[in-house]
Amino acid sequence: MGSIPDKILTWQMVQPTTFNRETKETTPGKIEKKEIPVPDLKPGEVLVEVAGCGVCHTDLGYFYDGVPTVSKPPLTLGHEISGTVVAGGEPWIGKEVIVPAVMPDRTCILCKTGRGNRCLGQKMPGNSLGSYGGFSSHIPVPSIDLCEVRDRGDIPLAHLAVVADAATTPYQAAKRADLQPGDNVVVIGITGGVGQYMGQMAKALGARNVIGIARNQEKLDRALQYGADFCINSKDKDVRRSRVNSRVIARKTV
């Protein structure tokens, strides 16, 4: 288990990339390596020593594409986080955890009807959790939302960071679609990160056939290696002539 640091080492977005529509000039974004104070933890909060943090396309959107963040720069990006609790509530000390990418407020109508992922008051590391994000040595987070890692075997803790978002996004889709063993599943956009996880998730949940549709042949071939049964390149195939007999669950991934 790590120790409580004197400072948090972080890579902060101090300026996102901007584009001037009048002059057509682009001002590159800027990320700086900084040391920031370790905050006093509030009741119910813990300090997590970060083992790994995935780079989500959302992070790229914040930095390169002008997608606004709730917390303004300087801001540490990163919301796919795994690590070890080093301070805070005693029951959590020393435990390996995954920090959810979305932390609902648990009070609104969406939360009370099981749609906490759509909560309008949600907090998100690297966006709306103050200035804190996963591209740092440590991050303070509410303990109520943590997912304890109890038996990861030989899988490095850092590799589990993507479970916070890239893996749980397709899992939620599969559960909401009521995917059943023996179903045939079509994954539209299987060549992206979420799409690849969707294909693997569907197979793990008992799908009879996983059919991937996308346009990048090299990545389609990779999807076959990761468990897809069939792949269709939409650039040179007539998808309308492709038939799947049995129940089909379609999931578009972006």
Regions flagged by a language model, labelled:
Residues 195-196:
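N-terminal Rossmann-fold NAD(P) dinucleotide-binding loop
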Residues 58-64:
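Cytochrome P450 core scaffold surrounding the K-helix E-X-X-R motif
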Residues 1-18:
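Eukaryotic N-terminal low-complexity, Ser/Thr- and Lys/Arg-rich leader segments
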Residues 105-189:
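NAD(P)H dinucleotide-binding glycine-rich loop of Rossmann-like/cofactor-binding domains
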Residues 27-37:
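Short glycine/threonine/proline-enriched tight-turn/helix- or strand-capping micro-motif at secondary-structure
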Residues 187, 203-254:
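Adenosine-nucleotide cofactor-binding segment
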Residues 8, 95, 182-183, 208:
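Nucleotide donor/acceptor-binding cores
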Residues 37-53, 66-112, 132, 150-153:
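Glycine-rich beta-strand-centered segment in the early N-terminal region that forms part
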